[in-house]
Every structure is written in structure tokens, then in C-alpha cells.
């Protein structure tokens, strides 16, 4: 529940209203997982229902601020102290697609793998380019489409770099997995060809059709 706890982490630094939370969440993650304001306020309503945040007044413009409670702070610290569970991994669309493709007749599975590899390699190149620009001190994109201050290796910039590097490592692993899938597919094709050849050898040859022998006609 990263959004829920991400908002608690921001509120632990002081009261904020919905749009501020959205902007700061996206700034710290490099807008990798964009949020809409409605999603933020829906999450805040659930946090308030669970006693983890409380309304903290409004400003002159009518923005409703929220503050974290002691219970919310305790849940946040428990989240930081606990490993992310991997026993129930989130759904992965690519894994589901390939699992279905290999079981549905008529799907060109190698073509699916090759298409995904091209896309993943392009994404990997883009992520690597962004990392190079950040480390070179260039500006980085923001959630609103503008640019942030130059990367200085601290605060939100460091948070964004960590997220970016996670995407790089994740995409590298995905490309390696796609290579592995292609190897598996080639092995399966070889096994199927060997079985087909064996079946042809084991099939008994069809018996020759009996030759029809007619009686010789005699003439008087």
C-alpha cells in the first residue's frame, strides 16, 4: 500500500493538503507513478476513517489540511521497519500475457517476446539517459512538465535517483528474463520436433492393398 504509507510519510513532516501531497509524492518519485488529486483525497478519507490522520484546519484559500496522528506515525514506522512481502507478488501483466500466449493455439509467442524486448530495451535506454543527465547536473522533469533544480544528490533528487535506478535494474532483469523465455521456447520447439519424428518412426507402415486376381476367361 505504497500510496497510503507515502502520504503518511509526507504528513509526518507536517500538515499538508491534497494538492501539496500529490506534488511532493511525484517530486520524490520523479513522477514515475503519477497520482490524481481524487486518488489522494480518497486515500486521505480512508486514513481519517482508520484514525491515522485528522483534519488540521484550512488556510485562507479553503485548502483542507491533514495531520498525522500517533497511530498513523506508529503505522508509518512499522512500514519502514518491515520488509515488503514477496510471498504474494503483485500481478505482472507481461508474465500473465506470456503465460496465456504459450497456452493459446495460434499465438506467435516468439514474436510477442521479441516485440516486448524491443520495447524494454528502449525503456532501459531512456532510463539510463535520464540517470546520466541527473548525475551530470542537468535539470530533471517534474510532474507538471517543467524542470526541477539541478540534481545535487540530496533530498528529493536522491529519492528520484533511487527510483530511477530501481527502474533500470528492474528493466535489465526483464530483458534477461525475456532472453530466458526465448531459450525455453526454443527448447520446447526442439522437444516437440523430436516427439513428432519419434511418432512417425513408431507408426506402423500401412499394409499394402491386396492385389485383386480375377479368373481367366476361357473361350469356347
Which role fits each region the language model picked out?
Residues 1-93:
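Basic helix-turn-helix/winged-helix DNA-binding cores
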Residues 113, 130-220:
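Charged, low-complexity intrinsically disordered regulatory/assembly segments
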Residues 78-134:
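Amphipathic alpha-helical dimerization/coiled-coil segments
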Residues 12, 16, 30, 85, ...:
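Residues in soluble alpha-helical coiled-coils and helical-bundle/repeat scaffolds
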Residues 48, 73, 121-128, 172, ...:
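Structural signal for well-ordered, non-membrane alpha-helices
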Residues 67, 97-99, 163:
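Conserved beta-strand segments that form the floor/walls of ligand-binding pockets within enzyme
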Residues 25, 44, 117, 124, ...:
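Short amphipathic alpha-helical/adjacent loop interface patches that line ligand
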Amino acid at each position: 500500500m505504497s500510496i497510503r504509507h507515502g502520504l503518511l510519510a509526507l504528513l509526518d513532516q507536517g500538515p499538508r493538503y491534497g494538492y501539496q501531497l500529490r506534488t511532493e509524492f511525484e517530486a520524490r518519485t520523479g513522477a514515475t507513478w503519477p497520482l490524481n488529486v481524487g486518488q489522494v483525497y480518497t486515500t486521505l478519507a480512508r486514513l481519517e476513517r482508520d484514525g491515522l490522520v485528522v483534519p488540521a484546519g484550512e488556510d485562507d484559500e479553503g485548502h483542507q489540511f491533514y495531520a498525522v496522528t500517533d497511530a498513523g506515525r506508529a503505522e508509518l514506522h512499522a512500514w519502514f521497519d518491515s520488509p515488503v512481502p514477496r510471498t504474494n507478488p503483485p500481478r505482472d501483466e507481461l508474465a500473465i500475457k506470456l503465460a496465456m500466449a504459450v497456452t493459446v493455439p495460434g499465438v506467435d509467442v516468439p514474436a510477442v517476446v521479441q516485440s516486448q524486448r524491443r520495447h524494454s530495451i528502449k525503456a532501459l535506454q531512456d532510463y539510463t539517459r535520464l540517470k546520466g543527465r541527473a548525475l551530470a547536473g542537468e535539470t530533471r522533469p517534474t510532474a507538471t512538465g517543467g524542470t526541477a533544480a539541478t540534481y545535487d544528490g540530496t533530498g528529493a533528487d536522491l529519492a528520484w535517483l533511487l527510483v530511477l535506478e530501481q527502474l533500470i535494474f528492474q528493466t535489465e532483469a526483464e530483458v534477461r528474463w525475456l532472453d530466458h523465455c526465448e531459450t525455453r521456447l526454443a527448447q520446447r520447439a526442439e522437444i516437440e520436433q523430436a516427439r513428432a519424428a519419434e511418432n512417425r518412426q513408431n507408426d506402423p507402415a500401412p499394409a499394402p492393398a491386396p492385389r485383386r486376381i480375377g479368373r481367366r476367361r476361357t473361350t469356347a
